[in-house]
Amino acid sequence: MHSTPDYRAMLAVALEEARTGLAEGGLPIGAAIFRVQEDGTVALISRGHNRRIQLGDPSLHGETDAFRNAGRQRSYRDLIMVTTLAPCWYCAGLIRQFGFRTVVIGESVNFSGGEHSLRELGLNVIDLADPECITMMRDYIAANPTVWNEDIGID
């Protein structure tokens, strides 16, 4: 029997990506994809951050950046998507489409997005309610409401 992965350590990778995105002038949303190996160790597959502002690509959310960086995988069912913020509907659709079974969320206080739909589909959704994720996103939204609304598709 394997022990539970250290989700907070996994979130630390996504948080580092979120900080990078913020430093680049973008939204502070990061993601990382991991695989739990047969022996219980956790391997980082990829990482990414929201680069919508930096590259002018409205589809380049944190989860999609990490997904693209993962390249082709034979299966996504045994991978864990870790994100600093609850996935929006677009990213939740990607998670569903490719069959991820576990999603670790840094926070859903500032935005719950498609979290509930993922739970309803039977995915293992782990919300860590991380204080740094909550504060970073709250402060960003307060300082950049127009950019934030654009990111989640609100006019």
Ranges and model annotations:
Residues 45-48:
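A structural microfeature
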